[in-house]
Amino acid sequence: GTTPQHIAALRTALDALPEALPAAPAAKPAAAAKPAVETDDAFLRKLRTGQRVIAVELDSPKDADLTAYLEGARRLQAAGADLLTIADCPIARARMDSSLVACRVHRELGMNVLPHMTCRDRNLNATKALLLGLYAEGVREVLAITGDPIPTAERDEVKNVYQFNSRKLAQYIVSLAGEGREMPAPITVFGALNLNARNFEVELRRAAEKLEN
């Protein structure tokens, strides 16, 4: 048990402490968030000033090796291509993700890229996550398209999503940008126009609706 001697020893130890404990260092004020720095987009600048632009489509590889692809992109850049456009699993066959390939090309070559983004394979959450990643990597253009349907023979194993159509996808992408929103500046959305559509008047009307959105 505690005896008077213990209490006296405790009192002596307390008396030996300094009268005031040192104050904790003052917290430094948090740095203000830096405004988003926009990348210089040579492709959009040429497009908006009416200059001729050269866009070349180069499908992503079917395997995990990007060596030959990057070399091909480098040669196209040297030949004068302003933009590399990358299909999103064309004819619904799996290839390396177009957005990830676009990020790699943009990061390593400094080349403008236009990854295609289909409605076929992603729901809203997956679409938003991918767009945020593209923005963080400096990719500021996407092509919003419906996407080729899954071949009938594969539909038991591979499922369509189609939470959006291409017009709603374009509208959703635009809605993510602005003050207080997820993206400080917008991603430019491009659309497709099928010149060989069976009913071109309908196709043209749909294109006009995309522009309105």
Model features per residue range: what roles?
Residues T2-I7, Q77, A81-V101, P149-V161:
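Glycine-rich, proline-tolerant flexible connector loops at the mouths of alpha/beta enzymes
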Residues T12-T67, E71, H106, V174-A185:
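N-terminal amphipathic alpha-helix/helix-capping segment at the start of soluble metabolic enzymes
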Residues T3-Q5, S60-A64, P90-R95, R120-N123, ...:
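Short, small-residue-enriched loops and turns at beta-alpha junctions
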Residues A26-A36, E141-N213:
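Conserved anion-binding
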Residues L44-T49, A73-G80, S99-G110, L131-V139, ...:
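Acidic (Asp/Glu)-rich catalytic clusters
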Residues M117-C119, N125-I150:
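A generic, well-ordered mixed alpha/beta core segment in the N-terminal half of proteins
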Residues D63-L76, S98, L124-L131, N199-E209:
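Short, acidic/polar
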Residues G1, I54-D59, D82-I86, V113-M117, ...:
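Hydrophobic faces of well-ordered beta-strands that scaffold small-molecule active sites
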